[in-house]
């Protein structure tokens, strides 16, 4: 049993690894933010943060960090229509009808950091419904119009889970020189 308090979980190693790619000081959206572990991370790096979750208790907990929006994004309208962010972070959440809204929320030169459960997870735990598990290569397909900087798909042992994760940039550079995306800090 975990001794970490709910809402105090550490930043995802994937999110931490790629945070340096976000433009300095850009606004960051944490979608399905829960109790704000990634909002805390980006706020500590000097980013203004916006979190969306349907749980009013979670939103109350994160409201001191930045903009906190309580919304049922699966059954209601997208609450950020017309707004864009330099960083969009999604972890442990999948609702396919939102793909176009998520991608439209990414500003030019903005970075998408996405990590969630994948096919095979049903053999080791929850979530196990196919609706909540990415199919092989699905994030690559969704991000085909973005510049993919990193992608992983596979199994992690502690705790056991099948994951798919991607870091992708909405490039605005039309120069002949390719943009350098550092693979580490």
State where each predicted segment sits:
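S-adenosyl-L-methionine
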Residues: 1-23
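Conserved class I S-adenosyl-L-methionine
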Residues: 25-34
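Class I SAM-dependent methyltransferase SAM/SAH-binding core
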Residues: 35-75
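A short acidic, Gly/Pro-enriched loop at the edge of an enzyme's catalytic core
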Residues: 78-87
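Helix-to-beta-strand junctions that scaffold the AdoMet/dcAdoMet cofactor pocket
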Residues: 106-108
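Conserved beta-strand signature within the Rossmann-like core of class I S-adenosyl-L-methionine
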Residues: 110-119
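Short alpha-helix
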Residues: 131-145, 150
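Core SAM-dependent methyltransferase catalytic element
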Residues: 156-185
């Amino acid at each position: 049993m975990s001794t970490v308090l709910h809402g105090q979980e550490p930043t995802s190693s994937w999110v931490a690894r790629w945070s340096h790619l976000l433009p300095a000081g850009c606004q960051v959206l944490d979608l399905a933010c829960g109790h704000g572990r990634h909002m805390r991370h980006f706020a500590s790096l000097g980013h203004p943060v916006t979190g969306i979750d349907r749980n009013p208790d979670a939103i109350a907990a994160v409201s001191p960090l930045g903009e906190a929006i309580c919304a049922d994004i699966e059954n209601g309208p997208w609450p950020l229509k017309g707004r864009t962010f330099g960083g969009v972070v999604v972890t442990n959440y999948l609702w396919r009808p939102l793909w176009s809204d998520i991608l439209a929320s990414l500003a030019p030169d903005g970075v998408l950091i996405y990590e969630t459960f994948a096919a095979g997870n049903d053999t080791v735990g929850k979530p196990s419904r196919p609706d909540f598990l990415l199919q092989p290569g699905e994030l690559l397909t969704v991000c085909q119009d973005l510049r993919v900087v990193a992608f992983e798909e596979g199994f992690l042992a502690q705790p056991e889970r099948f994951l798919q994760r991607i870091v992708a940039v909405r490039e605005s550079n039309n120069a002949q020189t390719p943009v350098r995306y550092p693979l580490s800090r």
